[in-house]
């Protein structure tokens, strides 16, 4: 998340290259730049985390102002009670007329701690699971993947609600929507590994007014540290000199 926010690889970010650390204030983040340019910036759920920002000289989360008041009753035990989409609505309610905005919707789901058997209880069929070749193919693995899918669906529903909110206020066609992840699925040889399942994360971008030849599927190698300069270039804002990610406007 530090790399996404700063547009820099983790080996340049000192303490921020480690988990449960801090993000030194000297490293500029794209929400900070957008905020100075007049954007309303905010986040819900996971912004920059986990760690102690005060140790790096920061007083607030570099992802923006936190929106966290809206709660829900989770469908399953392991899910958090944050209503991410409703918090996004609260954020939109603070956007002034003609003010540009940037929001980070950071769900914790999918995350380990799945409720055992959640997949089967929602009617999913273990026999239809495509088991990656790096895992043993047995009932334990198949059902574990189904439980993972339940949390993926929870994420999907939150994104769908957020998109509908943009549509309601007439800003969907004028908004860059990026859906991605900070790491691979939380399974062996995936999250925290350099295997494909650990580094090959989803990335979908929608911007009808700005993307040429939309509807494409690309297999190009992309680094998520390139998102920060891409956002700033798309907004017509100068990219900080310390940023060494490359924009893909």
Language-model segments: which ranges?
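Formylglycine-dependent sulfatase
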Residues: 1-249
